Amino acid sequence: MKFTKSLLLLIVAVFASSNAAETFSNFQVTNSEASSPCVTTPVELKVNTCQSACGSILNVLPVTGSTSKFTFNQFGAQDTKCAATPTSSNEFTCVDGKSKVAIGSTTYSVVCVPDKTNSSESDSSDSTRIGASFALAAAALLSMIAL
């Protein structure tokens, strides 16, 4: 009976630590063209979400059923602050699966910006949740050893 309780505590701890996922609200896109460098924070997105895709890079929502094509709105070069209405909407395809995407001959660097507005997903709550999970796992292991 004690062994079963300990095993259940260990399983709960593993699930609790795996649920400490980071959420993302914005994206930063840098244009590689020197003639029209443009950094947008955030990029205007079709869907304001962040997903794991193209290997290790976190990108915007894939285009219908595609795992390598994504959509974002491209700002015009005349808009130096990149704050006006986007000039067009584009699809981009992952190039190296890490951090670069290309539209035609232009390469963009895409970086997810962590969402810090949601208090339940803040750094402190994540570290607290993870710390509590490890403490629970340690307690479960100690009680199993004591048997």
From Swiss-Prot:
Major location (coarse): membrane
Superkingdom of source: Eukaryota
Glycosylation sites noted in the Swiss-Prot or TrEMBL record: 118
A molecular-function term among this protein's GO annotations: actin filament binding
GO cellular component: lamellar body; membrane; plasma membrane; side of membrane
Intracellular or extracellular location(s): Cell membrane
Annotated signal peptide: 1-20
Propeptide part(s) removed at maturation, as residue ranges: 119-147
Bilayer disposition of the protein: Lipid-anchor; GPI-anchor
Lipidation (GPI-like-anchor amidated asparagine): 118
Keywords per UniProt: Cell membrane, Glycoprotein, GPI-anchor, Lipoprotein, Membrane, Signal
UniProt keyword Lipid metabolism, yes or no: no
Keyword Phosphoprotein among record annotations: no
Family per record: Belongs to the ponticulin family.
Official protein name in the record: Ponticulin-like protein C4
Gene: ponC4
